[in-house]
């Protein structure tokens, strides 16, 4: 229903999905292992990649053939990919500082950094969603259909689903609660946000999947499914409370990979296109051919799920706000839930004493940690 995953390449398409999923989990485990691996992943490697990208783009603009024919220069030149790459990376780098209490990471005022950088990342996507909606509407008026060609040679189909999902993204920002409730785990491997429970994660995942499905169409099999499932899987089974760190780390790693190897996504046996492209056209991306037909049904369905799920979460937050008479953005609002308590049990001793002092609840008082 959502993707064209059949035919002679179906084995490789599913194999690619599994490899990306496992690869993201393993590289996230490497990144969270120690301060050294964290700085290697989000400072050392990004510096090297930045130098490479700088020379590729400069040489491409100067007309050097090797750069003009480079897949990164051709397929990853849009503002979104660069904004996302560096926004995700500085987010992960900030998380390393917080969990190890290095430099500004040891100050309480910096605890709001996770909220700030996640909000920025969401807004980047929201702007992109609205951009697609506007360009789709303009082309419908001028050319009679909603197709528009991105700077990276990908045909996108903008419509009301982008508007709906953009609104859902704005709501999602305010579904993040207890902005200063950020702590280190006992083993210092993880930055924990206990009040970011499954409700937010579900709403975020649906919203972000719809974003990738509408705007990163030829990449969404990987960055819309595998990339979202990897941090959620880790959070569910062994890294409770660390979802936002998992998400930032895997997103940073994925953006670096995609920026360097776009051919894996666009023109290989692993490439997958969504059902938006009504008929599977194997040369769709490679030859920049305008699709002959569109089926935006799935885009519309997921957009509705996105807005409904985010409205549901924000209503839950407001309901708890009224019942508890506590600001959900400066206080925990879900600290009576199992999700919160599972994360709380992983918090280091110094931070738990701070929570008991500032965030009293019967569940926390009953724990003997």
Language-model region placement:
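Membrane-interfacial helical/loop segments at transmembrane boundaries in membrane proteins
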Residues: 1-2, 62-77, 131-155, 268-293
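An N-terminal, globular interaction/scaffold subdomain
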Residues: 2-103
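Juxtamembrane loop-transmembrane helix junctions in multi-pass integral membrane proteins
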Residues: 4-7, 72, 102-105, 152, ...
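Alpha-helical transmembrane segments of polytopic membrane proteins
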Residues: 8-18, 41-49, 74-93, 108-125, ...
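C-terminal transmembrane-bundle signature of multipass membrane proteins
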Residues: 13, 17-25, 223-365
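Hydrophobic alpha-helical transmembrane segments and adjacent interfacial helices
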Residues: 25-29, 45-63, 91-102, 117-132, ...
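Membrane-helix interface "capping/anchor" motifs
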Residues: 29-39, 100-111, 236-249
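Generic multipass alpha-helical transmembrane bundles of integral membrane proteins
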Residues: 105-241
